[in-house]
Curated annotation (Swiss-Prot):
GO function terms (MF aspect): cAMP binding; cGMP binding; intracellularly cAMP-activated cation channel activity; intracellularly cGMP-activated cation channel activity; protein-containing complex binding
Biased composition (Basic residues): 87-96
Stretches that traverse the bilayer: 122-143, 154-174, 200-218, 224-242, 250-273, 297-331, 332-356
Name by which UniProt lists this protein: Cyclic nucleotide-gated channel rod photoreceptor subunit alpha
Keywords: cAMP, cAMP-binding, Ion channel, Ion transport, Ligand-gated ion channel, Membrane, Nucleotide-binding, Sensory transduction, Transmembrane, Transmembrane helix, Transport, Vision
Record lineage: Eukaryota, Metazoa, Chordata, Craniata, Vertebrata
Cytoplasmic side stretches: 1-121, 175-199, 243-249, 357-645
């Protein structure tokens, strides 16, 4: 209960009255000075001096305040959670938008180096070739246009659809930028629109066919703008030339096609001129079509083609021209024939010579060997063996020097080709089975192909082993000293000589061959020399130790290892080899240093000459500027000296 003094309004001695208010219902209304449920009574005067508070009401007020705070806090927490949820929703939406934008950016792109693009080039080449051959023919030969009108309309508009699709394909064809394939749609469209090809493509699909409604259907030359898409045909031929395994044959076929198209166009123009002058008007034009034999469409085209071929190739005789226009046309034909066919025939000749270049070079080697053997009086049997060996190389297409061919490739591609061809073969060798990949790659690049004739000895017993061999193709026999008795026959994938090139200490055979190995027929082998192996092992000391350990184990199994010698310290020969290698390295370094010093001296002399020339040019200029400076600023009087009047 809260007691407050409400009012005093008597003039006589004041007896204050006290109004007792029950504020348990709502303490907030008391603070505002109002209470809907006020219960008031007046207390006698002495109590009017005091405000009376009920403790229970205070506790209730505190509880209610706490409840309000908790409610407000709960509301705030709820709002915070809602805000978080909204933010998360916005983030998810942004992520989805970003993914959608990425999907839009990373649209389906055609790789210009892929098969899909090449196949599309073939598809677009067909309508281009159709337009280049049939539009001119239909325009000149009326029967050809009128008799097959429905067919021409179908093929024309199918080719137009392919033309339009080709423009879409161009907007989806990627291109390389800084070595990466561009896949952004906007960039692809902008690049295509800014190119000359877009303008030509756009002109080639302008619907000039609409003029049919005005001029009639007998004017197929209205579609002449379709010929502007010829660049696609050239691109297809270029890519086919790089893809085919027979490029020379393709080039010749391509040139023949160009010749036929030129003759075809010239024949159509000849028939058109004859029609304009009048059939049978003179001896030069096409004969009169009133004759049934010359009225046939086939005869018209074949006769014109025959005349065009004779004129452009300048072979045979044609009827002489009569009118001025006929003379002019024949002169132009002769000039075109001379220029075009001279170029084409020259190209064909160079292609044929290139096709025979390999054979000519190979034949030159054989001729040189024959002359040498004849000059040195080599026996006929040996001469026959040499010629048979050359014949085997040419017949089996092994006359090409692999190193000469692969030298034009970068080291990385050369290594990949060598790995693809030789790595599996090298892994079959026991001592190289567990070697690291880097060493195997080094060794693969050092394998040298060799071909042996029947009866050739690859190695003889007691020879110093400087190479190891891997059989690629053929059969070798381990024979006795008589060369006839065969102990073992080695076939494809076999190898020998791997221990001798390691020069293992304690080997009872040293680095000598322990058997005679002879080729039974023609054999293809890969050879790895000791020097190449040691050069590769200098960068792989752990691999070298592992190979020597494997070699020792193989020798121990065969009983060819002296363990006491093997357990001794380093061999003096090894130290000598190392010293010799160091001396060679020092010599190479000295040579390089001397070359660098000479280059430095030459560069220093050039700089001195240039400085001298600069001084000569600038010296008079500097002197003139110094004189001008002295004239502009004359010397002043010395300080402390005054002039007397």
């Amino acid at each position: 209960m809260k007691v407050g003094v409400i009012e005093t309004h008597h003039s006589h001695p004041i007896i204050p009255s006290v109004v007792v208010q029950d504020t348990s219902e709502d303490p907030g209304l008391i603070e505002k000075g109002e209470n809907r449920f006020a219960r008031q009574w007046y207390l006698p005067g002495a109590f009017a001096q005091y405000n009376i508070n009920n403790n229970s009401n205070k506790d209730e007020e505190k509880k209610k305040k706490k409840e309000k705070k908790s409610k407000s806090e709960n509301k705030k927490d709820g709002e915070r959670q809602k805000n978080k949820e909204k933010k998360e929703k916005h983030k998810n939406k942004d992520k989805k938008k970003g993914k959608e934008e990425e999907k839009k950016k990373d649209i389906f792109i055609i790789d210009p180096a892929g098969n899909m693009y090449y196949n599309w080039l073939f598809c677009i080449t067909m309508p281009v070739m159709y337009n280049w051959t049939m539009i001119i023919a239909r325009a000149c030969f009326d029967e050809l246009q009128n008799d097959y009108l429905a067919v021409w309309f179908i093929v024309d508009y199918v080719s137009d659809v392919i033309y339009i699709a080709d423009m879409f394909v161009r907007t989806r064809t990627g291109y390389l930028e800084q070595g990466l394939l561009v896949k952004e749609e906007q960039k692809l469209k902008e690049k295509y629109k800014s190119s000359l090809q877009f303008k030509l493509d756009f002109l080639s699909i302008i619907p000039t066919d609409l003029l049919y409604f005005k001029l009639g259907l007998n004017y197929p030359e209205l579609r002449i703008n379709r010929l502007l898409r010829v660049a696609r045909m050239f691109e297809f031929f270029q890519r086919t030339e790089t893809r085919t395994n027979y490029p020379n044959i393709f080039r010749i076929s391509n040139l023949v096609m160009y010749i036929v198209i030129i003759i075809h166009w010239n024949a159509c123009v000849y028939y058109s001129i004859s029609k304009a002058i009048g059939f049978g008007a003179d001896t030069w034009v096409y004969p009169n079509t009133s004759h049934p034999e010359f009225a046939r469409l086939t005869r018209k085209y074949v006769y014109s083609l025959y005349w065009s071929t004779l004129t452009l190739t300048t072979i045979g005789e044609t009827p002489p021209p009569v009118r001025d226009s006929e003379y002019f046309f024949v002169v132009v034909d002769f000039l075109v024939g001379v220029l075009i066919f001279a170029t084409i025939v020259g190209n064909v000749g160079s292609m044929i010579s290139n096709m025979n270049a390999a054979r000519a070079e190979f034949q030159a080697k054989i001729d040189a060997i024959k002359q040498y053997m004849h000059f040195r009086n080599v026996s006929k049997d040996m001469e026959k063996r040499v010629i048979k060996w050359f014949d085997y190389l040419w017949t089996n297409k092994k006359a090409v020097d692999e190193r000469e061919v692969l030298k034009y490739l970068p080291d990385k591609l050369r290594a990949e080709i060598a790995i693809n061809v030789h790595l599996e073969t090298l892994k079959k060798v026991r001592i190289f089975a567990d070697c690291e990949a880097g060493l195997l790659v080094e060794l693969v690049l050092k394998l040298q192909p060799q071909v042996y004739s029947p009866g050739d000895y690859i190695c003889r017993k007691g020879d110093i082993g400087r190479e190891m061999y891997i059989i690629k193709e053929g059969k070798l026999a381990v024979v006795a000293d008589d060369g006839v008795t065969q102990f073992v026959v080695l076939s494809d994938g076999s190898y020998f000589g791997e221990i001798s090139i390691l020069n293992i200490k304690g080997s009872k055979a040293g680095n000598r061959r322990t058997a005679n190995i002879r080729s039974i027929g023609y054999s293809d082998l890969f050879c790895l020399s000791k020097d190449d192996l040691m050069e590769a092992l200098t960068e792989y000391p752990d691999a070298k130790a592992m190979l020597e350990e494997k070699g020792k184990q193989i020798l121990m199994k065969d009983g060819l290892l002296d363990i006491e010698v093997a357990n001794l310290g380093s061999d003096p020969k090894d130290l000598e080899e190392k010293v010799a290698y160091m001396e060679g390295s020092m010599d190479r370094l000295q040579t390089k240093f001397a070359r660098l010093l000479a280059e430095y001296d030459a560069a220093q002399q050039k700089l001195k000459k240039r400085l001298t020339q600069i001084e000569k040019i600038l010296k008079p200029v500097m002197e003139q500027e110094f004189l001008d400076f002295e004239e502009a600023d004359p010397p002043t009087d010395k300080p402390g000296v005054t002039k007397t009047e």
